[in-house]
Amino acid sequence: MSLFTHVLACLFGIGSWVAINGMWVELPLIVTAIPEGWLLPSYLTIIIQMANIGPLFITLMHRFRPGVLDERPVIYTIVAVGVVATFLLAFLWKHTLTFGDGEHSAALLSLSFLLSVVDCTSSVTFLPFMMRLQPQYLTTYFIGEGLSGLVPALVALVQGVGVVHCKNASANANFSLGNISQSLLETHYQPANFSTQGFFLFLSAMMMVCLGAFLLLNLHPAVAREHKSMKGYIDDSRRVEKIDLSQSPNDETPEQRPMLDFPEGSAIKQRSSFGKGTYSRTELVFIFVVLAWVNALTNAVLPSVQSYSCLPYGNQAYHLAATLSSVANPVACFIAMFVPIRSLVLMGVLTVTGTGFGAYIMAMAALSPCPLLINDDLGAALIVITWVIFVLSLSYVKVIIGVILRDEGHSALVWCGAVVQLGSMLGALSMFPLISVYRLFQSGDPCNTKCP
């Protein structure tokens, strides 16, 4: 076992989702500077769902042309695209084009789509590559995958968020009774500790580190000794379920693992059943309904309205909610790694609890730009704490479901991945028209919005 290989596996895992996770925690600084404004989170949610064309293509290739697609050229391609896209974002994220009904952040949205394709495709290519190494390096890879959310969140906390200053400006309003002068306030944002450009360059550097780690995992002589024999790799690649996922500290994301069903033999068909049969059909339906529900909430519904629920309380509240909730996800994984309670009752209680906190978030978003306690520091503290508890509780639920379904066999994990994507897709499709078409949620101005 090589420490050098462990470090490379960890750095490789960090590159899996660092770009999109970084985009989410940087939104508090981006939404105030682009034409889409508060609508950007809902756009980003639907973009990520569209990016599933990447893993869909890889999955279909593995399903209908098994053994034809080598994941290594795909990984080189997507990581290189990630490096270039994040680098371009650093210089183009503010650039707009005028078309249709006004200005749009074409560069930001198109590059975000590329990054979404990169990260979504990593879910079905990085792990098959790790199967080429000895099994003990899987644990380190999953630690890196968990850090892909934690590292950009910590950097964003250091970055901070610009303080809002309101400056007087005069505006003339012409009425039928005469010319009346009224005082308006202009919003000015003080720069953060370092710029959004610097943050995207950091993400580009992280993707370059991932690319370098991948190169060394393929080419370094010390790592070559850690590779399995070709026969062992081929056998494992045809039996993805043989990986011991119980070693993973990041069990909350079974949807990020390749769960491909290759009906090539009786042994595989047998393993594709729901394993131990520990749970009744009703209990399994309950588990999958909960899985779809929590993924709809955490991956689409609530992230789409995060700006509406937090920005009325100020940029600082939005910044803390975005970053601390990103930290809450790996914290939930860490807790579940040591306390993996497979209780359906606990799962139900945590789901109801998380949904309750989610309902509070949705209510504050619906009341935007004048939610409860808008003029009180308690309101800002409550919305940040609510976001953290919401993510923490439902992330733990996803971990428990992943553990349960992993024990039930390969077929259960296949259904797990499908239900996760279905829940996320339904959540995104339901929220996008409400936010972007019917405009049921209202944005505000930090200086001129007057609330009772």
UniProtKB/Swiss-Prot annotation:
Membrane topology: Multi-pass membrane protein
Residue ranges that the Swiss-Prot or TrEMBL entry lists as coiled coil: none
Catalytic activity: riboflavin(in) = riboflavin(out)
Localization per Swiss-Prot or TrEMBL: Cell membrane
Keyword Cell inner membrane: no
Swiss-Prot/TrEMBL keywords: Cell membrane, Glycoprotein, Membrane, Transmembrane, Transmembrane helix, Transport
Main location: membrane
InterPro entries tied to this protein: Riboflavin_transptr
GO cellular component: plasma membrane
GO biological process: riboflavin transport
Family assignment from sequence similarity: Belongs to the riboflavin transporter family.
Its biological purpose: Plasma membrane transporter mediating the uptake by cells of the water soluble vitamin B2/riboflavin that plays a key role in biochemical oxidation-reduction reactions of the carbohydrate, lipid, and amino acid metabolism.
UniProt name for this protein: Solute carrier family 52, riboflavin transporter, member 3-B
Gene: slc52a3b
